[in-house]
Amino acid sequence: MAVVIRRASLEDLPAIIKIQHSAFEIESRLYGGRPIPPMWETVDDVAADWPSTLVLVAEVDGQIVGSVRGRLDGDTCHVGRLSVHPEHQGRGVGTQLMLAVEEAFPQARRFELFTGHLSERNLRLYGRIGYVEFRREPVGDGVWLVYMQKDGTTASASSA
């Protein structure tokens, strides 16, 4: 399975949102099926952030199967909305997207992201590529967000 990572275009947004909704719907089951923000995000929401956010997509056989976003704030790149179509999860697509977003921000001294405390697959993936937990915040109903970071100089070296 050859995966091609490229910069997204505005025309890709409907496919990106569809995959994001299906991926995060599965994620929401870990938290009792409660809706989580990525599930109600719209094409217009993503388009509004377009000028300040890099969106990358992963394609297999010309079909979008995943995406990730990165936004530089000072010397920190905030990584978010890593989404892989359920049929393509567990095949390295998420890892490739994460490494590609890091590579796209060589000026970043730090990468930061968050995920839910019950999202073991996410936590394992991020840990495997060098992210470490630095904070947990409660968001209600026993759910915690786990904030993770990675040194930008390490990111450049690991994606080489």
Predicted regions and their residues:
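A short helix-loop-beta-strand connector motif used in the catalytic cores of GNAT acetyltransferases and
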Residues: 44-57, 78
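Conserved acetyl-CoA-binding loop-helix of GNAT-fold acetyltransferases
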Residues: 84, 90-103, 124, 128
